[in-house]
Regions:
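Glycine/threonine-rich flexible loop motifs
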Residues: 89-99
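Short, active-site-adjacent cap segments at secondary-structure transitions
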Residues: 90, 122-125, 191-193
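Conserved anion/nucleotide-ligand pocket segment
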Residues: 151-195
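Patatin-like phospholipase A catalytic core
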Residues: 8-10, 190-191, 195-198, 202-206
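Class I SAM-dependent methyltransferase SAM-binding "motif I" and its flanking Rossmann-like core
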Residues: 42, 102, 106-163
Length: 206
């Protein structure tokens, strides 16, 4: 059964990620920062690293864009917990498709691998990421010829709802796609716990 933790901002939901991982014997996380590659600001990546380290986990960095497909497959084969960072969603999907490992990740999740997705890493669990073009610049991914993603969740997560500097872009996304898609807006202090087809949104009470 698929188990996912989807958040806008991992550092803002540290108590919730602790709850998600509380009974997990595995202490190594495969950490994918790829979505942040084209971004100027990457502070959230370091914050996520520190959050996991403070919880007692070790981190194995895997940049999809800079790693050969076979090595990625070998690493994922032994991965029990996969974290995918925030950044540009279109670039992330482009690189996952370039290495042809989207289905590998889906299969691993369906077979029990825990998945933690932050912002872009959460968005790619939906069926299609085109709705995020208001928040993210899709021109950064010129080789991406379609926006079909993992199709694990029945909803379309909208991170950073009403959070600076995304107030206008989240409002505009809801205005344009709110009646077309099952949008699930979450703030930077909220996370979605997914268990199979069931899910619950929780707020980090700090």
């Amino acid at each position: 059964m698929s188990k996912l933790f989807l958040t806008s901002y991992l550092a803002g939901t540290k108590n919730l990620v602790k709850e998600f991982l509380k009974d997990v014997p595995e202490k190594e996380i495969t950490f994918v920062p790829t979505a942040s590659n084209p971004e100027d600001y990457k502070g959230y990546v370091d914050e996520a690293k520190q959050a996991f380290l403070k919880l007692g986990f070790s981190i194995n960095i895997l940049d999809i864009s800079k790693t050969e497909k076979q090595k990625i497959e070998n690493i994922l084969k032994d991965t029990k917990i996969l974290y995918v960072s925030g950044g540009n969603t279109f670039y992330l999907l482009q690189e996952l498709k370039r290495k042809k490992i989207l289905d590998t990740i889906k299969d691993k999740i369906s077979n029990g691998m825990l998945y933690i997705g932050e912002s872009a890493g959460a968005i790619i669990t939906s069926k299609n990421i085109e709705y995020n073009q208001i928040m993210d610049n899709k021109d950064i991914a010129p080789d991406l010829d379609n926006y079909e993603a993992m199709n694990i969740t029945d909803f379309y997560i909208l991170p950073h709802n009403n959070e600076f500097p995304f107030v206008e872009s989240t409002k505009e996304t809801i205005k344009i796609y709110g009646n077309k898609l099952n949008l699930l807006p979450i703030s930077n202090s909220e996370a979605v716990f997914v268990n199979g087809k069931d899910f619950v949104v929780k707020n980090d009470d700090k």
